[in-house]
Amino acid sequence: MEIEILGQEDNPLLHRTDVQFKIVHDDATPSRLSVRDSLAAKLDKDSEEVVVHELDTKFGMRKTRGRAKVYDSPAQAAEVEHDHMLERNKIGADDADAEEAE
């Protein structure tokens, strides 16, 4: 899986960078978590700071376009993002599991 950054736009008010990217893959569309981890590695960020919002693969193509938001810290992501986006990206899931266990 190859990731190419198509564009970045800083949003200092929300302490994040909006990123548009393209993925070239050999098999099926990669999972949101594998894209998040690969994108975080490419941007030299922690995977908890990256929230993948959209993955769009055209029928029969081995290319996927997507959008992600890269925050300055996981706390900023948890404060700004909707709960369902945090669940999809498995951000803060370990904390919630620990609270439920107690």
UniProtKB/Swiss-Prot annotation:
GO terms, molecular function: structural constituent of ribosome
GO cellular component: ribonucleoprotein complex; ribosome
Pfam families referenced in this protein's UniProt entry, alphabetically: Ribosomal_S24e (PF01282)
Ribonucleoprotein recorded as keyword: yes
Basic and acidic residues composition-biased segments: 79-93
Presence of keyword S-adenosyl-L-methionine: no
Transmembrane stretches, start-end: none
Chain spans, region Disordered: 70-102
Annotated GO biological process: translation
Domain of life the protein comes from: Archaea
Annotated keywords: Ribonucleoprotein, Ribosomal protein
Record-annotated disulphide pairs: none
Classification via PANTHER family: 40S RIBOSOMAL PROTEIN S24
Protein name as annotated: Small ribosomal subunit protein eS24
Organism: Halobacterium salinarum (strain ATCC 700922 / JCM 11081 / NRC-1) (Halobacterium halobium)
